[in-house]
Amino acid sequence: MTEYTPMIKQYLEIKDKYQDAFLFFRLGDFYEMFFEDALNASQILEITLTGREGGTKEKIPMCGVPYHSASGYIDTLIEKGYKVAICEQVEDPKTTKGMVKREVVQLISPGTVMDERGLKAKENNYIASLYCYEAKEYGFAYSDLSTGELKSTVIEASEDRLINELTTLSTRELIVSSSEKEVLSDVMKEQLGLTFSVHEEDTIPVENEKLVTRHMSLSEKRAIGKLLHYLKETQKRDLGHLQQAVHYETSNYMKMDYYSKRNLELAESIRGKGRQGTLLWLLDNTQTAMGGRMLKQWIDRPLIDRKKIIDRQNDVSELMAHFFERLELVENLKNVYDLERLAGRVAYGNVNARDLIQLRNSLYQIPRIRATLLSMSSESLTELANQLDPCEELTEKLEEAIMDSAPISIREGGIIKDGYNSQLDTYRDASRNGKTWIAELERKERELTGIKTMKVGFNRVFGYYIEVTRANTHLLPEGRYERKQTLTNAERYITPELKEKEKLILDAEEKSMELEYQLFSEVREMVKDYIERLQKLAKSVSEIDCLQSFADISEKNHFIRPTLSEDGSLHVKQGRHPVVEKVMGAQSYVANDCDLDENREILLITGPNMSGKSTYMRQVALTAICAQVGCFVPAEEAILPIFDQIFTRIGAADDLIAGQSTFMVEMLEARNAIVHATKDSLILFDEIGRGTATYDGMALAQAIIEYIHENVHAKTLFSTHYHELTDLEKELSGLQNIHVSAVEENGKVVFLHKIKEGPADKSYGIHVAELAELPKSLIERASRILEQLENDDKKIIIASVKQPEEVHEEVQLSMFPVEPEKKASSKETKLLKEIASMNIMQMTPMDAMNKLYELQSKIH
């Protein structure tokens, strides 16, 4: 058995309790890692791997980072989904005999980050917990530790529902029991980008019982208990900033699954996965970090309560009507600090003097914001204004105590104002007078010795000294000057008078800094008493910030106030896609109408690729979402229903569905929509059926349309390349054909991007291929095939189309060798017709590969 050194034994004992984390083991001025942690961390952090004697024949792998710069390394590990256990020396090595005692003082994980550098200002950092009750329902709770937010609900015991909730929140970490983790699918565990943490205890800690209300269900309480226990065990400190748990119902908000939100690019771009080009990016003119976070919450959960929507609309109208007051409001909001996260850091004991200065400056703005809102006539804005708590006593205390120029460090003085504490003033006077005396001493000594270059200096090692260049040392009188330090070109001395004064000055400075830190700590503790009030203030300021952002964006982009229909009808005149219009410019964007009602429930959209079908469909959904978050909408006129759900199937397979084909994903999403949609829902289906054989796809598309028409009655926009489906208008009374128009000019196609009634007369697919700059010979061949197919009622065999005489090189697109004179078999005819009808430009690489496999299987 290996006999490790005492220090390595101590390390291994602590590491055994934190197997799923990197253990940052404090040794002097470094955090060291050993064994496997060292091997892994050296690669991830790109730091040097060394070795240390530890009682074994070979050196133990070791790497380390300086403690004063450790936060950057910790952030890197957390960002990659790892956990870090911070193990500190809890005894003073100078006064301890033998091994210094060490303990883990905090476990930092992706869901428990508190350092500002590891957080994004306008994004929440959520950690969630799950409790499965008899496989019937999930108790679900989540918190943003940095703000103190704590919420809970009960959801159906369905992995889809759980994924929707986790992705809506952009959850970083999920706490589950070991048995719960076992039943979650590998796809969910591997593809969501979550850190899973196993924790079994799920009763409410005694000190946190006040955070839970009686009416909550058992599963909900257990989920909250699991979350609170985990936070208590990992953070190892008071979590007094956690707010009372708020129960919410997912049914109180418009429902959209993860795929719909991604397809509509509400808060995350499909292309770069950032905010650029999303609805959130467009609507965000918030001036505060907490306002930005609330705006994302609003967009993630649009309202379905008519009164709440109208209240927000009224506030936006009022703010738009008071331009100059709104400008003043914006200027005041710019000076408001992140009060939510400040309250969290106060609870953690992590605030410095500059944080308190920013808090004070923020509180200065509150009476001004309140006065501006009260000058308007909106009842809800007046109510918001009256909720603004200026915390006057706290403001006065901070004004009285903290210097404007206070440093970041809280242990080196310069924080507390003169006049705040008489004892501190006494120490400061002694220090300042002593320094004045030293300056006078330098002048006198120069006169006495005649050495004009003589100077009095100070450093932390030797204290005060008189420095004389070596060339002038012979001018010093004997007896008074005691040599203290020898330099290359100078000598440093001390005199009895300087030695005496040095003690007085240094004692005063030391006592001053000790007292100043004590006074600062008292002020910081006082701020703790205001945490709850600051959190409530932050919510009110955030709401005001979101509303002014809506007003500003609506005015700048010429949005109008929508009317909410009572009968479920939708009528939009000259609607625009808000994000596309912003990117393209208002002059370039082509606006379109949209009308849906009980007699016109389904719009079947045809038209060429690149003509704007998908953009049109998305703009209808985004218009509805803008309305239901309380913002104005991009249109000339708009009458909109309140949608309970939006379902979309737009674009290729999503990367969340690992191992599924595009067609399988298509069918799963179609099923999700037609099973869960109601007459109050909106469905957007783009090219359903394209991932399988032509006739299969057409049959499925028709069946889906008929099912929605006969059973669901949801408002539906259905785009298709199957022009045969346009005949459904004759059979289905609630279906209307529309198309995106295009014209040919000089043999070239021009997309007008204008929606018109009726079906498209042709698809212009070859023109799109030409725009994509496919080889000219290929385009010519496709044109001839198309012409022959149209002339022969689509019964032509590809290989039988003769090449014109002027074409000298044979261009053979068929995958199958066919003799020129030989007539194709019926099997070959079907295959060739299928190839001819393929819409190549609409296919993803995966679609094309699937199609090739399918065709190949039909040959053999």
UniProtKB/Swiss-Prot annotation:
<dbReference type="InterPro" id="IPR007860">
    <property type="entry name" value="DNA_mmatch_repair_MutS_con_dom"/>
</dbReference>
<keyword id="KW-0227">DNA damage</keyword>
<dbReference type="InterPro" id="IPR045076">
    <property type="entry name" value="MutS"/>
</dbReference>
<dbReference type="GO" id="GO:0006298">
    <property type="term" value="P:mismatch repair"/>
</dbReference>
<dbReference type="InterPro" id="IPR007861">
    <property type="entry name" value="DNA_mismatch_repair_MutS_clamp"/>
</dbReference>
<dbReference type="Pfam" id="PF05192">
    <property type="entry name" value="MutS_III"/>
</dbReference>
<comment type="function">
    <text>This protein is involved in the repair of mismatches in DNA. It is possible that it carries out the mismatch recognition step. This protein has a weak ATPase activity.</text>
</comment>
<dbReference type="GO" id="GO:0005829">
    <property type="term" value="C:cytosol"/>
</dbReference>
<feature type="binding site">
    <location>
        <begin position="607"/>
        <end position="614"/>
    </location>
    <ligand>
        <name>ATP</name>
    </ligand>
</feature>
<keyword id="KW-0238">DNA-binding</keyword>
<keyword id="KW-0547">Nucleotide-binding</keyword>
<dbReference type="Pfam" id="PF05190">
    <property type="entry name" value="MutS_IV"/>
</dbReference>
<keyword id="KW-0234">DNA repair</keyword>
<dbReference type="InterPro" id="IPR017261">
    <property type="entry name" value="DNA_mismatch_repair_MutS/MSH"/>
</dbReference>
<dbReference type="Pfam" id="PF01624">
    <property type="entry name" value="MutS_I"/>
</dbReference>
<dbReference type="InterPro" id="IPR016151">
    <property type="entry name" value="DNA_mismatch_repair_MutS_N"/>
</dbReference>
<dbReference type="InterPro" id="IPR005748">
    <property type="entry name" value="DNA_mismatch_repair_MutS"/>
</dbReference>
<dbReference type="InterPro" id="IPR027417">
    <property type="entry name" value="P-loop_NTPase"/>
</dbReference>
<comment type="similarity">
    <text>Belongs to the DNA mismatch repair MutS family.</text>
</comment>
<dbReference type="GO" id="GO:0005524">
    <property type="term" value="F:ATP binding"/>
</dbReference>
<dbReference type="Pfam" id="PF05188">
    <property type="entry name" value="MutS_II"/>
</dbReference>
<dbReference type="InterPro" id="IPR000432">
    <property type="entry name" value="DNA_mismatch_repair_MutS_C"/>
</dbReference>
<dbReference type="InterPro" id="IPR007695">
    <property type="entry name" value="DNA_mismatch_repair_MutS-lik_N"/>
</dbReference>
<dbReference type="InterPro" id="IPR036187">
    <property type="entry name" value="DNA_mismatch_repair_MutS_sf"/>
</dbReference>
<dbReference type="GO" id="GO:0003684">
    <property type="term" value="F:damaged DNA binding"/>
</dbReference>
<dbReference type="InterPro" id="IPR036678">
    <property type="entry name" value="MutS_con_dom_sf"/>
</dbReference>
<dbReference type="GO" id="GO:0140664">
    <property type="term" value="F:ATP-dependent DNA damage sensor activity"/>
</dbReference>
<dbReference type="Pfam" id="PF00488">
    <property type="entry name" value="MutS_V"/>
</dbReference>
<keyword id="KW-0067">ATP-binding</keyword>
<protein>
    <recommendedName>
        <fullName>DNA mismatch repair protein MutS</fullName>
    </recommendedName>
</protein>
<dbReference type="InterPro" id="IPR007696">
    <property type="entry name" value="DNA_mismatch_repair_MutS_core"/>
</dbReference>
<dbReference type="GO" id="GO:0030983">
    <property type="term" value="F:mismatched DNA binding"/>
</dbReference>
